[in-house]
């Protein structure tokens, strides 16, 4: 019986590239010119407070967060009701990895100036970063209520909805953000990703291409476009996009991993192996890259090397069901069926609807003359393949069950 060799890890089509460009950043434009009402609480009456505030802004923009923090604190000390200084202080604290302290400062700013949409927006960003999505959504909505044309708030509200799996709501917000700020490339990329998740590949591709038209060096958009093309069964075109993504972001391991998968799909195993190794060189703890490298080595029948990589993938990600299946395949090929059976069962315990794990387990059990258990696993595999509308594998399972029944009768 021929066993199905396991597929490349599906993680290549997740959003595993850097998301550094996928949020509009904080509202750092807390300069006085942005405040239209001269009688608002945010305006400083103390010139020294204003000078320290401006110094804080300048230092923040230069990346000197400690210096900016000190300047904003001096401004607040000189004028305790200086709402914009609290926002600036919150920004510096957040960028220093102190989100809870930042949240407190944004809330203080809001208490002093409840009409400042930027304070709600920045509070929303920080809450989202600490996975308080419902609270973040509430703040983005408050910002939008105060400023309906606030593109950044619509965009990040879309991000929060996407993180909650609310794709329709995310599309609505991204579409609104595009209407308000049509030249911001990441919005198109994010909209494309939602469409991708809905299985609308052509529409997703159109959005990724729009993102690239506004920012030709946008590595993430090239990467996502590559994923969509790969999903369409166009590995050659995917290779071109992954190569572009790598050229613009040469230290990001996800690009190399994805390029490796596209090359694997073209049957270029040596080239694929080289890309997986590059991915691992940039991130030695990249479990999926170790798994994919193992799969390529397995395809070359380099069993000891494949086993080493599958084992490493499992060490890095103990819930990596595909790695257990791959390891089981290699063990079985080495004449270690009992170890293989144990690994297949581990994969199934992690992913109970893993059709290929049941299928491969059944083959090994059949070879070991454990025919009753083999048939049970074949039937489970068939049920799952049927649900996936995988007619080819359903027919293959039927043939194997028939062979076992013929042999036992």
Predicted regions and their residues:
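Terminal, low-structured helical/coil segments at or just beyond the last alpha-helical repeat
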Residues: 3, 10, 29-41, 367-409
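Helix-start (N-cap) detector for alpha-helical repeat units in TPR-like alpha-solenoids
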Residues: 49-50, 83-84, 117-118, 151-152, ...
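Alpha-helical segment of the N-proximal tetratricopeptide repeat
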Residues: 47-78, 91-95, 125-129, 159, ...
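Register position in tetratricopeptide repeats
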Residues: 61, 95-96, 129-130, 163-164, ...
